[in-house]
Amino acid sequence: MANCYFDVSSNGKPLGRIVFELYDDVVPRTTNNFRQLCLNPPGKGFKHSIFHRVIPDFMIQGGDFTNGNGTGGESIYGKKFEDENFQKKHVERGMLSMANAGPNTNGSQFFITVTKTPWLDGKHVVFGKVIEGYDQVVKAMEKTGSQSGKTSSVLKIEDCGTL
């Protein structure tokens, strides 16, 4: 299956491209959801949505394409879908994982780890990892964050899709 990408900007200035490898063989429903949301038009997927929460030394969160503040988003299967499995772990920086509000509440929100986060294992479904753009793009995004998660600039997915 194809890898996915985000072209990210900070306050309208291009930061670069992040490329994700997705674990289709381990969590096919979860990766199908993410891949389709990368291909959908603005308002129906990730294109033109923002990263609403960035906490340095922890993670970068996005995927709320309906409200833009962490309260919304929806999966291609309906509002929410189940935790597929927890086979993959948060073992390093650059892991791509589903954000949720408890068991079996996956929608469209996701996060990228910027360190090991083993306390999230068994609670959040890891479905991919960053394979390009970590040092240039993800690190620059992390620098805009704060302990509260509020960002000092608008981090936007200008374009996204599959490669």
Curated annotation (Swiss-Prot):
The gene is PIG28. It is found in: Cytoplasm. It catalyses: [protein]-peptidylproline (omega=180) = [protein]-peptidylproline (omega=0). The keyword Thylakoid does not apply. It holds the Pfam family Pro_isomerase. It comes from Uromyces fabae. SUPFAM superfamilies: Cyclophilin-like (SSF50891). PPIases accelerate the folding of proteins. It catalyzes the cis-trans isomerization of proline imidic peptide bonds in oligopeptides. This is Peptidyl-prolyl cis-trans isomerase. One of its GO terms (biological process) is protein folding. InterPro entries: Cyclophilin-like_dom_sf, Cyclophilin-type_PPIase, Cyclophilin-type_PPIase_CS, Cyclophilin-type_PPIase_dom. The keyword Cytoplasm applies.
